[in-house]
Amino acid sequence: MSDDTTQIEPAMAQETSPRANTRKVFVKTYGCQMNVYDSQRMADSLAAEGYVATDTPDDADLVLLNTCHIREKASEKLYSALGRLRKMKDARAADGKELTIGVAGCVAQAEGQEILRRAPNVDLVIGPQTYHRLPNALARVRGGEKVVETDYAIEDKFEHLPAPRREETRKRGVSAFLAVQEGCDKFCTFCVVPYTRGSEVSRSVKQIVAEAERLADSGVRELTLLGQNVNAWHGEGEDGREWGLGELLFRLARIPGIARLRYTTSHPRDMDDSLIAAHRDLRQLMPYLHLPVQSGSDRILKAMNRRHKADEYLRLIERIRNVRPDMALSGDFIVGFPGETDQDFEDTMQLVRDVNYAQAYSFKYSPRPGTPGADLDDHVEEAVKDERLQRLQALLSAQQYAFQDSMIGRKMDVLLEKPGREAGQMVGRSPWLLPVIIDDNKDRVGDIIHVKIVSTGTNSLIAQKLA
């Protein structure tokens, strides 16, 4: 998952009561797709309380920062933002006005009271498992409390979140995220997720289908199922049998209006036969798979507690491509994990060559407090990490550009997602996730049209519509 920073657009929380004219919220999102989804659900919850969204903190009564804790710089971004908000809050106070500041997400879960110590201007700290309590927490803040809500709730948060209004969902577009699973039980030694998101929890089939049907009714054509370890999802199916993610995908594909399905992020250990069968038989399931491996060295994979070997990963990729030859792969890589030798790194480079990724994310290892990796010895020098990352990214970039170039001349169906920058231009999404720009097009957002790729842009494809 990427670490792009986004914000909730004003359309995502509309006026629902007379109080809406006096209370505005600005939600800023750091981190992964799950955080984007969580921010949308928090916006829905606040809309039910009479808040309207604004695209700037300048006129907001509530600023909510939904944070990421995967890498150190994400925490640094939070405290930098809080420093700027402190000045804004002080200026408001000088004018006799109030600004409520809340911190949500994984940094909130990891640091809790420490956030209030480092940033006393913060009024509210709320974790990813308790944000359904946000309205109550804000009421306590208005009563003069400093609130920290980071316990793991006994109740099911999804049962306590209001469903977004149809008009609100419609304004979010024709592609949507849907969280089906949270948490992780893998305990990779570099990762904070088990400590910030908790143990693996799967939502029920009933909940998932109901939310998917609401999204489809609002015009959503493409669903991306989310989870920290999404292919670990399991639950009792409508036929009384135990279902895995493969069976769930087949069920969602039956919902009228849903034309495309994706899922992220996966673990190689949980790619079972039913999920591979879904890739073989389900045309709505797009031929793009994010399957992180982190390293190509068995020794480093063991130190990371990844629970698989490099050749097992490669054999899995072969199985998937045997049933879906047009499958494109993306992945995650960490360089400079403690003890990584030159040979370990070369093993990673070879695995990348063997797989030939369409896209990948790569990072230098940075120890996260509280993880087993932080206590490992034999740390790799920063200069060595830098050199290895540069080499790896050069190889991955070459593969990405080659993949884009391989699209030239191909014909494909594209889901139109939004107008382009120029008049008559539309931007769509290819089956392989790349944005596609189509000129002189009269079709509407939500239409799926047949195009031919004629050239490439920077991380995009240029297409002509076919009759």
UniProtKB/Swiss-Prot annotation:
Subcellular locations according to the entry: Cytoplasm
Catalytic activity: N(6)-dimethylallyladenosine(37) in tRNA + (sulfur carrier)-SH + AH2 + 2 S-adenosyl-L-methionine = 2-methylsulfanyl-N(6)-dimethylallyladenosine(37) in tRNA + (sulfur carrier)-H + 5'-deoxyadenosine + L-methionine + A + S-adenosyl-L-homocysteine + 2 H(+)
Major site of localization recorded for this protein: cytoplasm
Keyword Plastid assigned: no
GO function term, MF aspect, one: metal ion binding
Superkingdom: Bacteria
Cofactor: binding details: Binds 2 [4Fe-4S] clusters. One cluster is coordinated with 3 cysteines and an exchangeable S-adenosyl-L-methionine.
Ranges for domain MTTase N-terminal: 23-143
Record-listed [4Fe-4S] cluster 2 binding positions: 184, 188, 191
Required cofactor names: [4Fe-4S] cluster
Binding-site positions, [4Fe-4S] cluster 1: 32, 68, 106
CDD domains xrefs: Radical_SAM (cd01335)
GO cellular component: cytosol
Stretch list, region Disordered: 1-20
TRAM domain location: 405-467
Record-stated family: Belongs to the methylthiotransferase family. MiaB subfamily.
Assembly behavior: Monomer.
HAMAP family for the chain: tRNA_metthiotr_MiaB
Purpose of the protein: Catalyzes the methylthiolation of N6-(dimethylallyl)adenosine (i(6)A), leading to the formation of 2-methylthio-N6-(dimethylallyl)adenosine (ms(2)i(6)A) at position 37 in tRNAs that read codons beginning with uridine.
Entry protein name: tRNA-2-methylthio-N(6)-dimethylallyladenosine synthase
Organism: Brucella ovis (strain ATCC 25840 / 63/290 / NCTC 10512)
Gene coding for it: miaB
